[in-house]
Amino acid sequence: MMTDNRNTILAVILSGLVLIAWQYFYNVPAMEKQRAQQQAQAELQKTTPQPTASATPGATPQSGGAAQPSTPAAGQQAQPVVARDAAIAASPRVKIDTPRIAGSISLKGGRIDDVALVQYRETVDPKSPPIVLYSPSGTAEPYYAEFGWVPATGVTAKLPDAQTLWQQDGSGSLTPTTPAVLKWDNGEGLTFRRTISVDDHYLFTIKDEVSNVGNAPVTLYPFALISRHGTPQVSGYYILHEGLIGYLDGLQEYAYKKIDEAKSVNFKATNGWLGMTDKYWASALLPDTSAQLQARFSSNPVGNVHTYQTDYLLDPVTVAIGGSATANARLFAGAKEAGVVGINFPLAGHGGYNKELNLNHFDLLIDWGWFYFITKPMFLGLDFFYRFFGNFGISILLVTVIVKLLFFPLANKSYASMAKMKSIQPQLQALKERYPDDKVKQQQEMMEIYRKEKINPVAGCLPVVIQIPVFFSLYKVLFVTIEMRQAPFYGWIKDLSAPDPTNLFNLFGLIPLDPTTIPVFGHYLALGIWPIIMGITMWFQMKLNPTPPDPTQQMIFNWMPLIFTFMLAGFPAGLVIYWAWNNTLSVLQQSFIMRRNGVKVELFDNLKATFARKAT
């Protein structure tokens, strides 16, 4: 077999092994795990009452000077699960009305516990319900943020807690132009005032004030927490982090299972942030950048249900008689949009909250992965073209062209070397005939020919090898960025981040059957139109080189496009479109370079030979 064919086969097999490993360690386990979690969660919601949590964090301050508070108890108690609407109606509320958020603030406890993201729907159907981020205590999956004060050790003053009923100062909804003001008097000389503001995106600003008209000073610790009841379903498996996250003297990531084992982890940091992240959505506490934090990640089991919490305490403040104190906090609760969160990358132009608030690596809320140096610029390129064409599918096609142009010098050298390999095939064949039984002599003479002709025998692997990190980086962009979620292409592709919805095995919808639901093998039966197109383009790419004489190698060449077609069938449609388009460009590029080097392009001759053999 010709050396360029051997190199191509080697590169293809390498890619295939990577894809097989990817399928085995990610796709199939993730699907099985997700199904199991869905079943377990459904049973759990039927049989297990859900807890409500108190508003007190469990971190114990270690600052010097002031008396220390005792560690607050979890204070959780079980109660029956109620419908979300019923739980919302059970307490007086202040409505939240912004271009991106709809919901309410509970006056009982002063919690932000009702947040829906109105610009995002559960499915591609625009009439489907909006994504619900926060839900009140007592529902199936409580998730909320709370702010307040913790007393120092020895302080017995009554402070607002989860049961406190605040009063709204004034009336009306919380909007980007009208903050909500809450107030409460403990009847013992302390009055509390909370001003909550919200911007046009996903940022809440909370200003807590306490005034002391009593007969003794009090020392208090400002706190903030995010609490989430029940273990969420995770979709990323190993490809992205879902769980507790923060930047606390370095990036801290704890998956739910990991924090279940650790129970509680404490941190000290300045200019930090912390919260919980899902694939597309997140909730994060953003203290003042100059604040000294005593932060904590924790998991507290009540029966079979775990309550996950991220919280922090600030340095204590002493409120003198006749004096007052203020604590400021910020809360991000929304979609992980790159332009809103921010991208820390040269010339990115997406400062977002990361730059606006001078936060410490808040862009890491989006998991760009190990190949971030490729993933970030790839996303920026896709986003750039999207702003012009309004379609991420077109952006993928154009970015692929840009990538091809960037790597053209290397590909040109590689394909030129392959073209030279074709030109010396008669010499290599003569060597085999001259030294039929002396493989060592064959190799020595062959390497001498390579040296004389300045040919790199492994150059044919480079185009495919280079494509692998680009492939995974694009997969990462499609998988983790909210911008790609439910982004349509043309025709039947309504979501580039999901597999092609058509399926050959049910005759593209004519038969009422979903083959992908078949256990274990269902993922490989998601054979839509675009995977078939990708397989055809790969088959053309393989036919660009002559068929190798060895029967085993012929079989590899013939079966590889079909194998890749099935392996890529369950991948996001955007990735399959990229692969098909990249194959097409590779065929055109290789043909151009071969012609320029005076080598005949044998694509059509090889196709004719293939069909001629089948005809006979």
Curated annotation (Swiss-Prot):
The gene is yidC. Residues 44-71 have a biased composition (Polar residues). HAMAP family: YidC_type1. One of its GO terms (biological process) is protein transport. GO terms for cellular component: plasma membrane. It is a multi-pass membrane protein. Pfam families: 60KD_IMP (PF02096), YidC_periplas (PF14849). Required for the insertion and/or proper folding and/or complex formation of integral membrane proteins into the membrane. Involved in integration of membrane proteins that insert both dependently and independently of the Sec translocase complex, as well as at least some lipoproteins. Aids folding of multispanning membrane proteins. Belongs to the OXA1/ALB3/YidC family. Type 1 subfamily. Interacts with the Sec translocase complex via SecD. Specifically interacts with transmembrane segments of nascent integral membrane proteins during membrane integration. It is found in: Cell inner membrane. CDD domains: 5TM_YidC_Alb3, EcYidC-like_peri. Residues 37-80 are annotated as: Disordered. GO terms for molecular function: membrane insertase activity. The chain crosses the membrane at residues 9-29, 388-408, 462-482, 520-540, 559-579. It comes from Bradyrhizobium diazoefficiens (strain JCM 10833 / BCRC 13528 / IAM 13628 / NBRC 14792 / USDA 110). NCBIfam families: PRK01318.1-4, yidC_nterm, yidC_oxa1_cterm. It comes from the Bacteria. Its main location: membrane. This is Membrane protein insertase YidC. InterPro entries: Membr_insert_YidC (IPR019998), Membr_insert_YidC_N (IPR028053), YidC/ALB3/OXA1/COX18 (IPR001708), YidC/Oxa/ALB_C (IPR028055), YidC_ALB_C (IPR047196), YidC_periplasmic_sf (IPR038221). Keywords: Cell inner membrane, Cell membrane, Chaperone, Membrane, Protein transport, Transmembrane, Transmembrane helix, Transport.
